[in-house]
């Protein structure tokens, strides 16, 4: 075998190995994720959801994020060129805040009217007060709608099941030891009340 043939052979092996490594890593970044991955239970937090691609090449035009049960004071961040809608539901236990009774909370946040091409990524953020349930891992269902196609990032691994095997896993947020609930995101969301759609 000539030096050129050896070089080509080594190059091919490297390309295959490197390509395999990329394929192994790709699934971890191929679905909608939330950052941070964990936050103190009962605290105010800013959650950012990353949309890394469209639907098999089709641009993303709508994103729906369902708020975990027990979370309150939900406020979505304004995103240029996207409209924001909030879907509300009544609280089982109303509470008082800043001298007024809070009787409902945001159940879902919807961004629509924009167009995110498949070759680009973007991030969408909300602030909220997290449930005071230390040690619990919260799935946060997300529905990504495109010009053609839809992804329902709502799957949760069952006991003994590898979450990496799920084709459309829900973003997960782990609640760590409780906090004094002081931080960013104070305030309450003001949106339109609608029925709560099912993904």
Where do the model's predicted regions map?
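Bacterial N-terminal signal peptides that target proteins for export
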Residues: 2-18
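N-terminal signal peptide c-region/cleavage motif recognized by signal peptidases
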Residues: 25-27
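N-terminal edge beta-strand
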Residues: 29-51
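Low-complexity, serine/threonine/proline/glycine-rich extracellular segments that form mucin-like
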Residues: 44-82
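Extracellular adhesion/glycan-binding regions together with long Ser/Thr-
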Residues: 90-118
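Beta-sandwich strand segments
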Residues: 149-167
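Histidine-centered metal-binding segments
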Residues: 178-199
């Amino acid at each position: 075998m000539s030096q050129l043939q050896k070089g080509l052979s080594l190059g091919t092996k490297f390309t295959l190995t490197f390509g395999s490594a990329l394929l192994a890593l790709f699934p971890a970044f191929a679905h909608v994720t939330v950052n941070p991955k964990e936050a103190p239970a009962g605290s105010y937090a800013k959650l950012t959801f990353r949309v890394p691609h469209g639907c098999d090449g089709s641009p993303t035009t709508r994103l729906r994020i369902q708020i975990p049960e027990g979370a309150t004071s939900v406020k979505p961040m304004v995103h240029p060129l996207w409209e924001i809608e909030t879907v509300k539901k009544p609280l089982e236990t109303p509470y008082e805040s800043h001298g007024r009774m809070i009787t409902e909370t945001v159940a879902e946040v919807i961004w629509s009217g924009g167009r995110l091409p498949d070759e680009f990524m973007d991030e969408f953020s909300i602030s909220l007060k997290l449930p005071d349930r230390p040690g619990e891992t919260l799935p946060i269902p997300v529905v990504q709608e495109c010009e053609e196609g839809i992804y329902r990032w709502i799957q949760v691994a069952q006991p003994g099941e590898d979450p990496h095997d799920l084709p459309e896993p829900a973003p997960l947020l782990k609640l760590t030891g409780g906090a004094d609930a002081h931080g960013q995101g104070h305030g309450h969301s003001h949106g339109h009340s609608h029925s709560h759609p099912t993904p």
